[in-house]
A protein has these predicted regions:
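Conserved beta-strand->loop/alpha-helix structural units within folded catalytic cores of enzymes
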Residues: 138-141
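An N-terminal alpha-helical hairpin/helix-loop-helix interaction module that forms a charged
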Residues: 1-131, 147-218
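Small-residue hinge/turn detector
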Residues: 134-135
Length: 218
């Protein structure tokens, strides 16, 4: 019996304009991991010292997120989740000192730890605080710290995952992201020989599906 998902992955890998060749194999991609890690270390240090400030614009976080948003099409618009929305007063990590410290603790834990258990535990801790406007878009920061543990996240990736698996994952909730993450890990294990232990590869496949470049197998 033909494995339609395997055929899709092979076609995607051979597509010069797909995310596998245009982003995942891009030489600059790996260099950006180092600079993003250093940038997040600065964010953590500033929050701990009380010098981060109360605005996104001009902050060390803006610098990091901007460099992520420049990671070609898969991360285009990654900054939207962190932009201050004054009418909604979200994400509530700029004006609320306790929330800002909790956000810094999440990043600090994920910078220092190396295990899936610690990363997921840190996510549960930040989720328990129910900080307005601070959802799984943060996973795009964590991906650059732990690419084998945390898949990237955006609307197109969720759409692609739902199309490929028949799931109904929703945006904006950490528990939904973590459930999708488990499904992504299983998919990645099944097709590991064609993908990578770096979850950016399967994230790119799902992005291309969700953005309409490919149609999910029936």
């Amino acid at each position: 019996m033909t494995d339609l998902i395997r055929d899709l992955i092979l076609r995607w890998r051979d597509d010069p304009a797909g995310t596998y060749q245009s982003w995942f194999l891009w030489d600059e991609r790996l260099k950006n991991f180092r600079s993003i890690r250093r940038g997040l270390q600065l964010v953590v240090a500033e929050i701990a010292a009380g010098t981060f400030g109360v605005a996104y614009r001009g902050s060390s976080l803006e610098t990091v997120v901007h460099s992520i948003a420049e990671q070609r099409q898969i991360f285009k618009g990654a900054d939207h989740a962190f932009l201050w929305k004054p009418k909604l007063r979200i994400p509530d990590i700029y004006e609320n000192p306790a929330n800002q410290k909790a956000f810094g603790q999440l990043l600090d834990t994920c910078l220092c730890c190396n295990t899936e258990e610690h990363v997921v535990s840190a996510i549960h801790a930040i989720d328990a605080r129910k900080i307005k406007g601070l959802g799984p878009a943060v996973a795009n920061l964590l991906y650059f710290l732990h690419p084998t543990i945390m898949p990237p996240f955006n609307t197109a990736i969720v759409k692609g995952y739902n199309a490929l698996t028949g799931s109904k994952v929703k945006l904006g909730r950490w528990e939904e992201y973590l459930a999708m993450r488990q499904g992504i890990l299983k998919l990645n294990a099944t097709y590991r020989v064609l993908l990578s232990n770096d979850l950016g590869a399967i994230g790119g496949l799902l992005f291309d599906l969700g953005s309409g470049r490919y149609t999910a197998p029936p």
